[in-house]
């Protein structure tokens, strides 16, 4: 039986469109695997631990690039917990009328700025352990 926390993480990754491997992201973005890893370490791409590797939530990509404004939002979070960050990105916020990630995907500068302000405010505490 899978522990409750593991079930929640699987559901969260499913909600995020599934997880891509570093090789998948490398092909998608037309960059090397080393460049993918560097972007992850720099906080420009979100990756969640999956066994001894990482899964890159598919929702953070638009065609062959990362969602515009994503790296800015990840920097605003200042939380070194990828599962909490993923939950924040895909969970609808009443103030936005959508999830923070959906706000970025709408390419509306005011909505993007509001979502980034929420990311900064939410960085104070997350419920994942």
Locate the predicted segments by residue.
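Non-transmembrane "mature" sequence context
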Residues: 1-129
């Amino acid at each position: 039986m899978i522990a409750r926390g593991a079930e929640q993480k699987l559901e969260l990754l499913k909600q995020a469109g599934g997880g891509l491997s570093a090789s998948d992201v490398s092909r998608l973005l037309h960059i090397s695997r080393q460049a993918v890893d560097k972007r992850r370490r720099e906080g420009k791409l979100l990756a969640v631990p999956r066994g001894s590797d990482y899964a890159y939530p598919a929702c953070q990509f638009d065609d062959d690039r990362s969602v515009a404004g994503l790296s800015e939002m990840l920097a605003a979070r200042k939380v070194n917990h990828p599962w909490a960050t993923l939950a924040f990105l895909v969970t609808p916020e009443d103030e936005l009328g959508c999830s923070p990630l959906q706000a970025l995907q709408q390419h509306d500068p005011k909505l993007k700025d509001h979502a980034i302000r929420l990311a900064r405010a939410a960085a104070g505490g997350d419920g994942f352990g």
